[in-house]
Swiss-Prot record:
Gene Ontology molecular function terms on file: ATP binding; ATP-dependent protein folding chaperone; unfolded protein binding
UniProt feature, compositional bias: Acidic residues: 605-615
Region ranges (Disordered): 579-615
Bias (Low complexity) ranges: 581-600
SUPFAM superfamilies hit by this protein: Actin-like ATPase domain, Heat shock protein 70kD (HSP70), C-terminal subdomain, Heat shock protein 70kD (HSP70), peptide-binding domain
Family affiliation: Belongs to the heat shock protein 70 family.
Protein name (record): Chaperone protein DnaK
HAMAP family: DnaK
NCBIfam families: PRK00290.1, prok_dnaK
Function of the molecule: Acts as a chaperone.
Keywords: ATP-binding, Chaperone, Nucleotide-binding
Length: 615
């Protein structure tokens, strides 16, 4: 059975892990470590010559190719948003699939075997649409997503693997684009989520934007130039702001130095600005304060007080910032745990859950919850809840509804997710119609609506007329979710990208081999001297010229053909040079043999017989 990997598909950084010898191990990125350590940046870039770059290579070229570079796409998952690059539109699922495909390739290179299955983490506060979109992205990338689990839950798995005894923990997960606060109880191998709260539009990127706004405004005051009108300057500045934020986690001040950031009539302008940790902390105060509500909500939903919490685990890159750690400590009144890497623990926890599903890990039971209430729209535009938020999943709940008008022969089921009393204020997950209800006065027919949430947190709904036993079932899909046909089309497109990548790699390797062949052949011609006949030289030089002409074109097969022609031309000269060298060595050896006597007398040597049996 092939390995199931665990994937942390993040807004700013992504990582993956796998169980090796029962322990979660981070899968190294092909490019090595980056700003995120073993995690790699969640960047995807399309170049004008048709290449697709993912991770660190995409981030490095973002300054020179801002219009072709995409980052932070996770915030758009589960929406109808499309990003347009060089005239072509891409869905968030397609962009995320490129990141997942890179992870798949890195994992296969690391493990030396095919990887086809994965557990992918999502923010606990992701709704049904966002979870479905994540599964679709995995499918496009060629992965069977065997489970979707919540990021804080995964972090707790990584933290609690070696911990004994019962304890209540708070997982404060502040990532690049989302905040999740989860209260869990752990003990005897059982990880039970008691409540979860959060904000899917709050994270480290908001901190970057605060710093960015400050720098842009200060530069405008000093020079009169608004850098927001310059796309390339903003890309340079955005990257510098992120680096400065990271550096200020371990330093009291840092300098942003960007020469030639822009120019006006008076000439080029340079940006050189010192940022202190105190200034950054001042700028992000409003972001930190937005974290307070979800923390208090999670405690309230779990019916616990701050003093009931035994441990606080911090997850996500921004939690490395002293200001974030101090804020959580101030709100909760206790220190935070230091024994877990905030950038790696989610992927490691996903790998542990993968191990549970594969049967590699025993005695662990994960009880997660649904983050938002689920219900249907009823008469008057009211949302009637069937499943309350923070209900342990998987779960199933049924409720009887009836008709609102006389002789009504069909009912539309409008499925909703959220906490607002009016249907229009909640997230619409989908609609379907149950038909064939016998005409009857209103209030007489009995329609049983059943909500069934699976272990991935994905909803299945059915409606059944109890009189006729007619039933309609659907797996909820958002109106803008990709259809099965669209997903299959995206899978084929992804395969074409993989084929194109392989073709480009073959072309690069062939060109390198051709360049090397030309170099070694020209070196051989110089060393050959009079061994090479004029005819041989002419034939080889002509073959070199033809190969150079082929290299100036784009036909790989033509390059290979001309390489073969040059190799054949070189073969005859190589044989002649080898023969000359052999003759030279033979002559030298003969000279040595004739000098093995001393004064015309044979030199005798002592010898000892060795017994073959004891040798």
């Amino acid at each position: 059975m092939s390995k199931i990997i665990g994937i942390d598909l993040g807004t700013s950084n992504s990582a993956a892990a796998v169980l090796i010898g029962g322990r979660p191990t981070i899968i190294p990125s092909a490019e090595g470590t980056s700003l995120g350590g073993k995690a790699f940046p969640s960047y995807v870039a399309f170049t004008k010559d048709g290449q697709v770059l993912v991770g660190e290579p995409a981030r490095r070229q973002a300054i020179t190719n801002p219009e072709g570079t995409i980052t932070g796409i996770k915030r758009k998952m589960g929406t109808d948003y499309k990003v347009k690059v060089f005239g072509k539109e891409y869905t968030p699922e397609e962009i995320s699939a490129h990141i997942l495909r890179k992870i798949k390739q890195d994992a296969e290179a690391f493990l030396g075997e095919k990887v086809e299955k994965a557990v992918i983490t999502v923010p606990a506060y992701f709704n049904d649409n966002q979870r479905q979109a994540t599964k679709d992205a995995g499918t496009i990338a060629g992965l069977d997503v065997v489970r979707i689990i919540n990021e804080p839950t995964a972090a707790a798995l990584a933290y609690g693997l070696d911990k004994g005894g019962e304890q209540k923990i708070m997982v404060f997960d502040l990532g690049g684009g989302t905040l999740d606060v989860t209260i869990m109880e752990m003990g005897e191998g059982v990880f039970e989520v008691k409540s979860t709260s959060g904000d899917t539009q709050l994270g480290g990127r908001d901190m970057d934007e605060r710093l960015l706004d400050y720098i842009v405004e200060k530069f405008r005051q000093e020079t009169g130039i608004n850098l927001r009108n310059d796309v390339m300057a903003m890309q340079r500045l955005r990257e510098a702001a992120e680096v400065a934020k990271i550096e200020l986690s371990s330093m009291l001040q840092t300098t942003i130095n960007l020469p030639y950031i822009t120019a006006d009539a008076s000439g080029p302008k340079h940006l050189n600005m010192t940022i202190t940790r105190a200034k950054l902390e001042e700028l992000i105060q409003d972001v930190l304060e937005r974290c307070r509500g979800p923390m208090e909500q999670a405690l309230s939903d779990a019916k616990l007080s701050k003093s009931d919490i035994d441990k606080i685990i911090l997850v996500g890159g921004p939690t490395r910032m002293p200001a974030v750690q101090e804020f959580v400590k101030r709100v909760m009144g206790k220190d935070v745990e230091r024994g877990v890497d905030p950038m790696e623990c989610v992927a490691m926890g996903a790998a542990i859950q993968a191990g549970v599903l594969a049967g590699e890990v025993k005695d662990i039971l994960l009880l997660d919850v649904t983050p938002l209430s689920l219900g249907v729209e009823t008469l008057g535009g009211i949302m009637t809840r069937l499943i309350e938020r923070n209900t342990t999943i998987p779960t199933r709940k049924s409720q009887i509804f009836t008709t609102a008008a006389d002789n009504q022969t069909s009912v539309e089921i409008h499925v909703l997710q959220g906490e607002r009393p009016l249907a229009k204020d909640n997230i619409s997950l989908g609609r379907f119609t149950l038909v064939g209800i016998p005409p009857a006065p209103r209030g007489i027919p009995q329609i049983e609506v059943t909500f069934d949430i699976d272990a991935n947190g994905i909803l299945h709904v059915s409606a059944k007329d109890l009189a006729t036993k007619k039933e309609q079932r659907i797996t909820i899909t958002a109106p803008h979710r990709l259809s099965k046909e669209e997903i299959e089309q995206k899978v084929k497109e992804a395969e074409r990208y993989a084929q194109e990548d392989a073709r480009r790699r073959e072309e690069i390797e062939t060109r390198n081999q051709a360049d090397n062949l030309i170099y070694t052949t020209e070196k051989m011609l110089k060393e050959a001297g009079d061994v090479a006949t004029s005819e041989q030289r002419e034939r080889i030089e002509k073959a070199i010229s033809e190969l150079r002409d082929a290299l100036s074109g784009k036909d790989v097969q033509e390059i290979k053909s001309k390489m073969e022609k040059l190799q054949n031309a070189v073969y005859e000269l190589s044989a002649a040079m080898y023969q000359r060298a052999a003759q030279s060595q033979s002559g030298s050896a003969t000279g040595s043999a004739s000098g093995s006597t001393s004064g015309g007398k044979t030199v005798e040597a002592d010898y000892e017989v060795v017994n073959d049996d004891k040798r």
